[in-house]
Amino acid sequence: MKTLRRLLLLVLVVLCSLLFVQAQPKHKASKPKPVSCSQGTPYRGCPACGTAKDNKHRTLNVQKNRGTAVTSPQKITVQEIRNPANNTKFTPSKKVWVTGYVASVDPGGFQETCNCKRNDLRDVHINIVADPSEVGDQSKYVVVEFTPRWEKRFGFDDSNYDAMRQAVEDKIKGKWIKFSGWMLFDFIHANASQSTAPGNPVCPNDGKQHSGCNWRATPWEVHPVTAYTVVSGP
């Protein structure tokens, strides 16, 4: 009888221990705290880091939203920017100027986190090539961007985005333009770039958005552009 009581008592102790362990709050793996939005300066109520939640995207947004004009930029060519061998040689702190032929002026991303997903803050996406003969081959396109912080500085009225984008197109499309600005690696588009996803087919140049194909030469961009001028050639 004593043995049975001891056995029952032992079973009760084990059951109570298991119930206690299960009742304890489970601790999730701690996530790194987001970087502070103190970097950069807000623009029209949108912080430089935008609305991104993780550090990697916040850092990218701060780079996209730089408001300081480049000084003493170094010359770089369209061919050098899109060369896969240079993918690891550039840095986002690099100040450059590049002369390219403007193949197209397209709407920037809609409701991007860098612009706080706002409709009244939107980039202008400009595709440049090394020669007019490359127009239409999106695997050759290098992206440069006019951002909201610079659009007004360039004299464009951003109160109507479509009208502003058209004004930019009228001014620079089909011309040789010298762009000065900051280098930026937009890793978000690495899976749609010829230099980082060479196995993809090239997207058709039909003005529509496509997935699973390359619509640009490289994730490297000049973003933001902080000065531009029309020139006679490269």
Descriptions of predicted regions:
Residues 1-8:
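Bacterial N-terminal signal peptides that target proteins for export
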Residues 9-18:
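Bacterial N-terminal signal peptides
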Residues 24-234:
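OB-fold and OB-like single-stranded nucleic-acid-recognition modules
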Residues 19-23:
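Sec/Tat signal peptide C-region and signal peptidase I cleavage site
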